[in-house]
């Protein structure tokens, strides 16, 4: 069996790290909305793929996320066994830790599976307890 050589995209995804860039207008409150419609991960119970649209909304303070780094970093989830809740919370926490925004919301809108549609929402301004 011949060894499979990794494609350049696989290599970029493997080494992907989130990058913060300086906010060009830190004196102003403005909302950035990012939609990632092709999010995938693996169900930790069955191993079947889960598909979702990840929606990110934030009001930056000193930093904004560099979009290519975000895209590649989100693609790292595609071969991970992780629940909807854990994936959405991990995305939220990584962005919050990196950017320290004035406001952040991450929504994981997962495609129905077994006739169940799950939406996980994490916001910096809400206490759901």
UniProtKB/Swiss-Prot annotation:
Binding residues annotated for substrate, in chain numbering: 65-67, 84-85
Any Pfam family hit: QueF
GO biological process: queuosine biosynthetic process; tRNA modification
Enzyme class at the top of the EC tree: oxidoreductase
Presence of keyword Secreted: no
SUPFAM superfamilies given in the database record: Tetrahydrobiopterin biosynthesis enzymes-like
Catalytic residues (positions): 43 (thioimide intermediate), 50 (proton donor)
Any GO molecular function: preQ1 synthase activity
Catalysed reactions, as listed in the record: 7-aminomethyl-7-carbaguanine + 2 NADP(+) = 7-cyano-7-deazaguanine + 2 NADPH + 3 H(+)
Record bears the keyword Oxidoreductase: yes
Pathway(s) per entry: tRNA modification; tRNA-queuosine biosynthesis
InterPro entries: GTP-CH-I_C/QueF (IPR043133), NADPH_dep_7-cyano-7-deazaG_red (IPR050084), QueF (IPR029500), QueF_type1 (IPR016856)
One Gene Ontology CC term in the entry: cytosol
EC identifiers of the protein: 1.7.1.13
Subcellular location(s) per record: Cytoplasm
Keywords: Cytoplasm, NADP, Oxidoreductase, Queuosine biosynthesis
Highest taxon above the source species: Bacteria
Protein purpose: Catalyzes the NADPH-dependent reduction of 7-cyano-7-deazaguanine (preQ0) to 7-aminomethyl-7-deazaguanine (preQ1).
PANTHER family xrefs: NADPH-DEPENDENT 7-CYANO-7-DEAZAGUANINE REDUCTASE (PTHR34354:SF1)
Family: Belongs to the GTP cyclohydrolase I family. QueF type 1 subfamily.
Protein name: NADPH-dependent 7-cyano-7-deazaguanine reductase
Source species: Aquifex aeolicus (strain VF5)
Gene name tied to this protein: queF
């Amino acid at each position: 069996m011949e060894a499979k050589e990794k494609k350049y995209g696989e290599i970029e995804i493997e080494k992907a790290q989130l990058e913060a860039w300086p906010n060009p207008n830190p004196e102003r409150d403005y909302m950035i909305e990012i939609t990632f419609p092709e999010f995938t991960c693996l169900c930790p119970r069955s191993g079947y793929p889960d598909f979702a649209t990840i929606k990110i909304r934030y009001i930056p303070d000193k930093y904004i996320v560099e979009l290519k780094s975000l895209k590649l970093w989100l693609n790292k989830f595609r071969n991970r066994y992780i629940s909807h809740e854990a994936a959405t919370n991990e995305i939220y926490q990584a962005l919050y830790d990196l950017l320290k925004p004035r406001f952040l919301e991450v929504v994981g809108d997962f495609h129905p599976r077994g006739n169940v549609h799950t939406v996980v929402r994490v916001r910096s301004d809400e206490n759901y307890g």
